[in-house]
């Protein structure tokens, strides 16, 4: 994924939206890293899935003692420091709101330019496939 992220970073995103099924603490740490690395606000939206969200005729038996299958963890992360500025919202439905001053992202990109001089294109060669052609 680092090369895929690098390709997106080159476009200069200001807000990175990351939906996922991963509700682990490791995911939140990853999103904090991506905020700093990309210089973009990160809005992460892990799934909150209570057991009553499944229909009675769901084809796979669910463990009767498990009440939540995805605890959520929606959060907004600031790009300069990786600080969580809203959320995380666990174990319930809700709306996570943050005031995102996009100038902070521009400042973060000037401080840590992951696709500029830090990327060292003079020292590293990379090649990406032309995705408009069918795979062989």
List each language-model region with its residue ranges.
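CN hydrolase (nitrilase-like) catalytic-core segments centered on the catalytic cysteine
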Residues: 1-96
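Cysteine/selenocysteine-centered motifs that mediate thiol-based redox chemistry or coordinate metal-sulfur cofactors
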Residues: 105-136
């Amino acid at each position: 994924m680092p090369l895929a992220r690098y390709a997106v970073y080159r476009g200069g995103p200001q807000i990175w939206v990351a939906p996922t099924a991963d509700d682990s603490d490791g995911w939140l740490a990853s999103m904090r890293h991506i905020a700093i690395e990309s210089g973009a606000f990160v809005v992460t939206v892990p799934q909150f899935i209570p057991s009553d969200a499944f229909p009675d005729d769901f084809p796979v038996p669910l463990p009767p003692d498990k009440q939540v299958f995805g605890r959520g963890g929606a959060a907004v992360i600031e790009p300069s420091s990786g600080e969580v500025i809203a959320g995380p919202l666990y174990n319930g439905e809700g709306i996570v709101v943050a005031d995102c001053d996009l100038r902070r992202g521009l400042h973060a990109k000037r401080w840590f330019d992951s696709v500029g001089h830090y990327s060292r294109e003079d020292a590293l060669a990379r090649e990406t496939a032309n995705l408009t052609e069918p795979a062989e």
